Amino acid sequence: AHKHELLMSVWLHDIGKLVIPLEVMNKDARLLPEQKTAILHRFEKIRLLIQIASLKGEISVETMQEREEELQKAQETILRANTAGFCPDDLREEVCRIHEKTYMEEDGSEKPWLEEEEFQMLMIRRGTLSEEERAVMESHVVITDKLLSEIRFSKELSHVREWAASHHELLNGSGYPKHLTADQIPMEVRI
């Protein structure tokens, strides 16, 4: 019976993920796809504005080439930061420098190379989720607990809810959602 109880908790431990948005659940990069596309389009626009300035004689061909090269390096940095599992300080510093850069729109207004939200997403140090997205993702455990609290388990399966809802607890208390410590985490959950 104990084996069935453990197996049932394993089967149900992520049931709360059913209500987590797929764009959070399956997020494999810091930027959302539409943010990445917007950046690539913006950089292409900047590239074209640089070329137009050169054709108009406002900047030299050499200056145009330097600016295009700078833009290309910035784009490569952004793409690298977007998919890095861990974003080290030197990469974050490069992203900060890019964020400080601006370009001139056709109407004369000054615009940033990176929008604030794009910048914030690229500054995520570890993983791909923002604090808000991480909170949504971590809520699946609370949702699992809530869903399973609505089920009347038999006596033989009485620990299923507790075990399933504790699967992200860590021995040192840094897990979630209850921050249980080693002595509070059942052996079955540790498995």
Tell where the protein language model's regions lie, with residue ranges:
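Metal-dependent catalytic cores of enzymes that make or break cyclic nucleotides
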Residues: 1-191
